[in-house]
Amino acid sequence: MKVRAQIAMVLNLDKCIGCHTCSVTCKNVWTSREGMEYAWFNNVETKPGIGYPKEWENQDRWNGGWRRKRNGKIEPRIGAKWRVLANIFANPDLPEIDDYYEPFTFDYQHLQKAPELQAMPVARPRSLISGERMEKIEWGPNWEEILGGEFAKRSADVNFDGVQKEIYGQFENTFMMYLPRLCEHCLNPACVAACPSGAIYKREEDGIVLIDQDKCRGWRMCVSGCPYKKIYYNWSSGKSEKCIFCFPRIEAGQPTVCSETCVGRIRYLGVVLYDADRIEEAASVADEQDLYEAQLSIFLDPNDPAVLDQARADGVTENWLEAALRSPVWKMAMDWKVAFPLHPEYRTLPMVWYVPPLSPINAAAESGKIGFDGEMPDVRSLRIPLQYLANLLTAGEEEPVALGLERMLAMRAYMRSKTVDGVIDESIAHRVGLDGQMIEDMYQIMAIANYEDRFVIPTAHRELDEDAFDLRGSCGFSFGNGCSGGTTEPNLFGSPKKHVKTPMEVR
């Protein structure tokens, strides 16, 4: 057993209001610069829908993640090393800019400087890549916002597998949900295996996956290898970039920017201990529907003295062990089992988990489409949302999702009985395998949690990872990553790089 610690995140989709504050603040901090205009390290999608980039979940098209071979081993879906090298100059699995969207701005100055006309002046769109006029905006990162667009296009959502989507199409307002997405910082990241340059690595001390900008050569195999399509190519610098989990803030014990600014307070951050020796075993199970339970099995109980002793021997510091004891992520994923990984069938063992939304169940119950099982709506009779959520979160296995939804409904029924009727009904908790105290704890964390309850982040011990004395005087003030400016001035063929300038409209 090799104990490692990871900063993990849980997002409670039951509280997400789709305001995109997380996306905008992340964009302003990390990707508001040349070459990354189209990139959103954090974006919020409306489901059902094909998402951003288009059909990112369709691995038959993009070949992201891992696949299990006949001998029981796993390899990246894009192929073994020889196939990666064979396609290194012509990658057939690479999304194009139109699969994301062509970033644009508007001729705002025309509004100020236009001469007097009979009609109001209009700010027309212009490409941020070429600087040319765009006649029509074709797509965007939230194009399907609130079920926007035709159902014929949104029905390509792969989570409709096994779902009667024709019935959903007739009643397409039956349910919708918001899905905020960011890099999963997986335990078994496919992007690390796909990179020919070895530029991507997973930090041992906190599990954050990063790209070494000095090693990156822009081969973009990582873009294909990532099944969540959360690595972006910077066309200006010639490097790949991704969500860095705001590691400078994490090291200081502060939450990520998206978590800090979340209006709905849906995000939770905490430490999870896991057995690094069992990662391959968990990712290689034969049945995809067993991957969720396999990942749970490698998480280690921070209350176990044997685990704590081994963690200390493996270099996990005391403040991290104390944080693991108070981790809200551990409580939701392991104690209450109401949080689930996004598409575990990709075999990457993702570490950003989601609490499924109750809105489809409550909407159906209020409209009389499903009955009540005692105090709670009958979750299992609502086939379409349940199967859809199972395809999204547990590789199609409905039982864990149904139990998680029932426990959240039980929490509501229990607290309603306690606060409105003044009756503490333990039978509600017992029906879903909990007790009254666990329901109270769930309510405290998931409904009214304080800041320090949602974000249990220990400070980093950088002194254990590098010798600062040896680095003295090696780097002055610089912009970018370390001593690297983050830009490559000559282009691929040696001539000076041409910066795109947005032309002014002259009248």
What does each model-found stretch correspond to?
Residues M1-R507:
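Non-ligating segments of multi-cofactor redox enzymes
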